Amino acid sequence: TWYGKTLKNFDTDNKGECEWAPGGNFAVRKKSFTALGAFDSNFIGNAMLEDADFGFNIMRSGGRVIYNPGPVIEHLRVITGGTRKESPSKGMYYRSHNTVYFLRKHNLRLRILPAVFYLAAVAINDLINRKHGPLAIIWAKVGLIRGIFTKIQ
């Protein structure tokens, strides 16, 4: 969205062009993947937005991203593992960093301020609902600052 939220559970039966495809279920020729520089290693932690970045790079190079409703992937929300190994609150660091970095990289700087408010609301909501502790707010702040200063690849 214009304020940085990644839309989830988008379902359609229609095949067509889109800006990006979720990284857990997309295919690209190795030659094209390599030519575009693969995934940007500045996207850190929980694998968020590196797939959108790659889709934007495909389009910028004149390629197309096609959504095909045929293949289906089910994202299992396991209780342990993944980014939760370090600290549940640290996920806000990755999310904040990657969001700001993505918006800067793709010249969407006017969307950074709304994204900051959105990310702050997520961290506060998670605190109120006891999904994460108060450290989530600190991690979100650190991620925002680091995302602002990470050198663009």
Mark where each language-model region is.
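Non-catalytic, C-terminal membrane-associated alpha-helical segments of glycosyltransferases
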Residues: 89-98, 108-153
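Short, flexible, basic/aromatic active-site loop/helix in glycosyltransferases
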Residues: 1-19
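Short secondary-structure boundary/hinge segments and terminal tails
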Residues: 51, 76-77, 121
